[in-house]
Amino acid sequence: MSGCRYVKYGLLLLSMAAMAGVAHAGTIVSDDGVVIDATAMETGASVVPSSAGTGRGAIENLSAEGVMLASVPMSELLTYRPMTASVGIESILGFDSRVRVYTNRFPQRAIGLITFGTSRCTGWLIGANTVVTAGHCVAQGGSNRFYDRTTYRFYAGRNGSSSPYGVCTVKALWTSSTWLSTGNDQYDWGALKLNCTVGNTVGTFGFFYTGSSLLNEPTVISGYPGDKPLDQWQSVDKVRVNQTKRLFYKNDTIGGMSGSPVFSDRPPGAPYASNGVYAMGIHTYGVYNGLPFSTHNHATRIDQALFNNLISIRNQP
C-alpha cells in the first residue's frame, strides 16, 4: 500500500465535479467515499497464488468470524432477478454445455452467490474477506452511484437450498472510477469487502496478468445462472479472441453469472501461472452487435492495472 493516495468523500453518490478530478484508469473508489490512486502503486508481481483453504468448520464455528447465519428463504431468493449489463445478453451459444457442479470442494466453494436489492450476481474470493465480481453488480456504469451496500449478502458455495458456509454481509463496495463515471465496459469490474473471513475456510482463487496473448488458453466459468434454482453451473471452452482488456470465448452463460471467474486449473510448469487455480478475467457480457461481440461471450481481462487494483482492495481492512 506504500505510495497510495487517499481522498475521503464520505458520500454514496459521488458528485460529477468530484469524479471529474479522480476519474482515470488507475483510480478506484469505494461506496463510502475512499478513493485510491493505484497509478502510484506498483506491486512488482504478476501472479497471486491460489489457496484451497481449510475446508473445515461447521457453520456454527464460522459465526465467530462474523458470518451472518440468518438466511433469506430460498423461495424469496428465487424471485431475485439476475443482474445483467446494459448491453450484451449473456448467452447460450448453440448447444447448452453447462453442467452442474457441487460446492463441497475447491475451487467451487470459493465461488458464491451475491444478492442485493432484488438482484443477484456471482462472485469469487481472492482473500479472506475480498470478493471479485462485475462492475455492473456493484454500480450502474456512468451513474456515479453505487447500489445500496446494506442489502448485499454473499453466500460462499451456495448449493441449491443449502448455504454450507453461512451468509456474509458486506462492509464496502469497490469499482473503477472510470466505470462509475463513464460506464466504459473495459472497466466493468467490482469487488466486495465482507464482514467475515470465510475465504480462510473455503479457499481463495489465484489470479495473474500477462502482456502476452492468451489465445487458446482454457477458460472455465462457474457461477449461478438465473435459469437454475441457485445451483452452481460450469462451462468450459478457450480464449478465442484476445484483446488488451477483453477476453472472448464460447462458454455458455446466462444472466446471474455476471461476475463469475474466468479461470483454469494450471498444471506445474504452465506459462504465466502454474500449479494452482488461477483467474485471468471476470465474466461480464454476452452477445451484442458487431464482431467479435455478436458471436462470443466475454470477460473483463485482468491486466496489470486491474491486477494491482485487486491487490490493493484485498489489502484493505
Which ranges hold each PLM region?
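Cleavable N-terminal signal peptides
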Residues: 12-13, 23
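Catalytic nucleophile loop of clan PA
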Residues: 124, 252-283
